[in-house]
């Protein structure tokens, strides 16, 4: 195998693994509530998960755009621009996330007008949504981080983060549901914990692997 092909595979394979793990967060939640005895729980998680899939898909440009521009700056060895791109993408992600939190009620109401869930599903999905929406800063901030890592030709860190998120989600959700007696709120809190665990892990790994770039820590127009 040519060195160039090997380099491409080293970047592509971890990204493939990361993408495979993305749907697992929602599937894990559905699997857990499926044992609670009522199909309404599954419906609530399905509705809530669908809403967040749409929301985060809309803002997927944070990851893809950051990846492309970072790879260009990294190829030019423009390290100040590389760092500025990280700061900009994470800042935009956090700003958008806080707007989503402020607008969570009209977003949820508008979505339910289109979906028309039953009253029981609506009540549980509302609880799930209003807990998980607080994970938006972690998710959108992580979009910026993972896009930046990939642009730096390091797709292993996003893979490690994705795997860790799923493991934390399984442990936290199972513990909250079966040990603490929670139901939909336990699954939502487990997802929330996993999201912030992934975001914090991304920050720690950035500091460990790229902390030397802090000397370029500035934002220019």
For the regions a language model picked out, list residue spans one by one.
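Hydrophobic alpha-helical transmembrane bundles that constitute the permease/transmembrane domains
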Residues: 16, 20-28, 51-65, 102, ...
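Helix-loop interface residues and adjacent transmembrane-helix termini in multi-pass membrane transporters
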Residues: 24-27, 35-39, 73-76, 151-152, ...
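Residue-level signature of transmembrane alpha-helical cores of multipass secondary-active transporters
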Residues: 11-19, 53, 93, 132, ...
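Interfacial/gating helices of multi-pass transporter permease domains
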Residues: 33-53, 120-124, 184-185
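Alpha-helical transmembrane segments and their helix-entry boundary regions
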Residues: 8, 42, 155-159, 187-188
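Interfacial helix-capping/hinge residues at the ends of transmembrane alpha-helices
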Residues: 30, 67-71, 108-109, 146, ...
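Short alpha-helical transmembrane segments in multi-pass integral membrane proteins
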Residues: 1-12, 70-137, 177-221
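Small-residue-rich hydrophobic transmembrane alpha-helices
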Residues: 42-102, 139-157
């Amino acid at each position: 195998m040519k060195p160039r092909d090997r380099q491409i595979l080293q970047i592509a394979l971890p990204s493939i693994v990361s993408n495979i793990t993305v749907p697992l967060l929602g599937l894990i939640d559905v699997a857990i509530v499926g044992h609670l005895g009522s199909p309404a729980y599954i419906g609530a998680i399905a509705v809530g998960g669908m809403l967040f899939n749409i929301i985060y898909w809309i803002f997927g440009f944070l990851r893809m755009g950051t990846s492309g521009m970072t790879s260009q700056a990294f190829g030019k060895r423009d390290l100040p621009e590389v760092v500025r791109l990280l700061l900009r993408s994470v800042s935009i992600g956090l700003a958008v996330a806080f707007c989503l939190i402020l607008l969570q009620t009209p977003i949820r109401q508008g979505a339910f007008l289109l979906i028309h869930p039953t009253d029981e599903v609506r009540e549980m999905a509302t609880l799930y949504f209003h807990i998980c929406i607080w994970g938006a800063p972690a998710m959108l901030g992580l979009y910026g981080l993972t896009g930046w890592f990939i642009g730096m030709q390091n797709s292993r860190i996003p893979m490690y983060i994705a795997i860790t998120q799923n493991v934390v989600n399984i442990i936290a959700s199972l513990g909250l549901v079966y040990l603490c007696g929670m139901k939909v709120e336990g699954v939502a809190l487990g997802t929330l914990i996993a999201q912030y665990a992934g975001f914090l892990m991304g920050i720690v790994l950035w500091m460990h692997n790229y902390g030397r770039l802090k000397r370029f820590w500035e934002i220019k127009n």
